[in-house]
Amino acid sequence: MKFKQDYFDQLSGFYSQVTPQGLPRPQWLAWSEDAAALIGLKQPDDELLQGLAGNQAIPGASYYAQVYSGHQFGGYSPQLGDGRSIILGEAEGPQGYWDVALKGAGMTPYSRHGDGRAVMRSAVREFLVSEALHHLNIPTTRALAVIGSDLPVWRETQETAAITVRLAKSHIRFGHFEFFCHSEQGSKDKLKQLLDFTLSQHYPELSRDQAGYIAWFNRVVADTAKLIAHWQAVGFAHGVMNTDNMSILGDSFDFGPFAFLDTFEEDFICNHSDPNGRYAFGQQPGVGLWNLQRLAQALVPIIASDDLIAALNTYQHHLVQAYLVLMRDKLGIKLVEPAGSERDEADLQLIGGFTLLMEANRLDHTNTWRRFAQLDPNSQHSSLRDDFIDLAGFDTWYQAYQERLGQVSDVAGWQAVRAQVNPKYVLRNYLAQEAIIACEEGNTQPLAELHQLLTRPFDEQPEKEAYAKRPPEWGQGLIMSCSS
């Protein structure tokens, strides 16, 4: 790996330099060739294993933990920071630079009484979801590898330590700006320094003045809205949408007790530390705006309040428009003239009517949408109908749907497009859990097979049909722990 160190060199005081605590007897548990290509790596070898396990220095790496704060479940935590993640620097790849971070590489000044370790369970889940979201065409950080060991660590029970090697275009979070606004170490000059760095690295086309700052914040609002529209369309619940888990690039970031919906439930909670459902699936769009408002508050010293408010007021428009594009594609309906608020509202009612039916009839989210790839849209007798208990409700909806759809001239082509936007396979929690159990028993083959499956989520893969089934009784509606 060839590194540059722009964050380390240009933002002194925004991090602490640290030394990794290596993993004894490390072993490769998972490796993403896709992600490796981003930074010019090919096959994993023992030298790389020892380096990424924190056991020997990698030439050119700097090893630092970033400081930030954030709002967690609505309350402000004045200092958080990388408590177990160590960034090596920005690695050069064929099409740009990627931060390389070792998540679980030991204690830092920000560990807050933690041990700085990650357990194998959480490392495997982060690896799988990072790569799954990417192949679902959803903006996300990437995962290069999982490195396991036999080092015991204690959470609710004894587990083994592991490292996820994360790649990110940036690790700058909403919480970075909050820290340098609200903390004693912060100042207007440091906020401006951080924002100027962000623009120079990721938005070089924008000027480093008020006009550029406003344009940047508008971009962050739009990108965040579009990301959450993707989550809602595919049925992904992040689970811990704290502001320190929000990327300024609009990437999915910092995965814990996430879930893809099995049965469609608007109020589904995937995190057992969230009994009130602050981060329930259906709450995510509103939380996205709330988090942007917290970011805006932190930017008041350097961006005019009126401009921040004006940008925030565009969030709902960006969210709805992005959601409509995705859901029209899933349903196979075209945007017809006249476009505008009346047409959008009618389509939102059509989409909402279908999701309400799915919820009332306890249907599987992924499998139900996938059925549109086999649907004859011109037939009065929908193959979907048999899935519903409320036949009258479905018939009413389907009639409205066909009227909106119109006659389809190329049915096979229409179905093929639906198959490319309605995935057959998603990372169901029970599938991840089965792979984790196998890893605990020393068998990484199920993890490798699941990873490969998730790189082709839209393909039929008939030999993998079992992965598309609804979860067994033990795996239904799994609620995951924040402990990792």
From Swiss-Prot:
Catalytic activity entry: L-seryl-[protein] + ATP = 3-O-(5'-adenylyl)-L-seryl-[protein] + diphosphate; L-threonyl-[protein] + ATP = 3-O-(5'-adenylyl)-L-threonyl-[protein] + diphosphate; L-tyrosyl-[protein] + ATP = O-(5'-adenylyl)-L-tyrosyl-[protein] + diphosphate; L-histidyl-[protein] + UTP = N(tele)-(5'-uridylyl)-L-histidyl-[protein] + diphosphate
GO molecular function, a single term: magnesium ion binding
UniProt keyword terms in alphabetical order: ATP-binding, Magnesium, Manganese, Metal-binding, Nucleotide-binding, Nucleotidyltransferase, Transferase
Residues that coordinate or bind ATP: 81, 83-84, 103, 115-116, 166, 173, 254
Sections of the chain in a coiled coil: none
Record: active site: 244
Keyword set includes Metal-binding: yes
Enzyme Commission code: 2.7.7.-, 2.7.7.108
Cofactors: Mg(2+); Mn(2+)
Residues binding Mg(2+), per UniProt: 245, 254
Taxonomy, superkingdom: Bacteria
Entry similarity comment: Belongs to the SELO family.
Function: Nucleotidyltransferase involved in the post-translational modification of proteins. It can catalyze the addition of adenosine monophosphate (AMP) or uridine monophosphate (UMP) to a protein, resulting in modifications known as AMPylation and UMPylation.
Designated name of the protein: Protein nucleotidyltransferase YdiU
Species of provenance: Shewanella loihica (strain ATCC BAA-1088 / PV-4)
Gene name per UniProt: ydiU
